[in-house]
Amino acid sequence: MKALVGRFTVVAFLLLAFSASPRVRAEAPAEKPFGLPFADPPGPGTWLLGQTYGNTTGAYRQRRTTYNAGQGVHFGIDLSAACGTPIVAIGDGVVSKVDALSHGSAPHNLMIDHPNGYASFYGHLLERPRLTVGQPVTRGEVVAKVGDPDLTCTSRPHLHLEIRDAEEYRHLYNPVLFIEADWDSLALVGSFGRGFERDLDNPRRWQFLDDQPEVALWGGVLNEYARPWPPDWSGR
């Protein structure tokens, strides 16, 4: 009898522990629900993957400055393309924000809410999108144009694309897990992110395209390493 009571106690404790634990990581969808934000295939004359999502070396160097709000990681993907390149909606949805610069990615941006509970965010646009809040859009519909955060169209024109939760827009997810594409091939050329920063005390963590941390805005820097590689000579 005592053994039986003990087993029930252990089971009850485990159930309570799991129910009380916050949900830190969202489940990646079994089938990727979104498409790429360009109608044309990738290539030198169309677009290339510039910087991936996650613990990139570029974000690590700026973890306490530019990427401090995003827990020290690059919380979207950058797709290099010429200014004016048409951007298409990655899925059916409804426009929720236009030029909401509190979300960053100037000079112009766009947020689309999708019925599956996620939102797509398009940043560094050439001009204010000609859409209105509440307007429905369909997957593949042109919604914006690629711009340049430096306003030159020669320094670093690119689309910054994010996947967020559509409720608070505070949680950001790895687009690689949500967008159907040959990411391994895309990562072979065009990258300006120089790969992922490595923690020599945990060298295998966050070293692959599909193994990167989710982000909670203003949740505290995730990648303060005692032994980083490459070394952080700047100390920023």
Where in the sequence are the language-model features?
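Surface-exposed, glycine-biased beta-strand/turn segments
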Residues: 22-108, 139, 148, 188-236
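Zn2+-dependent peptidoglycan hydrolase active-site motif and core
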Residues: 90-129, 156-160
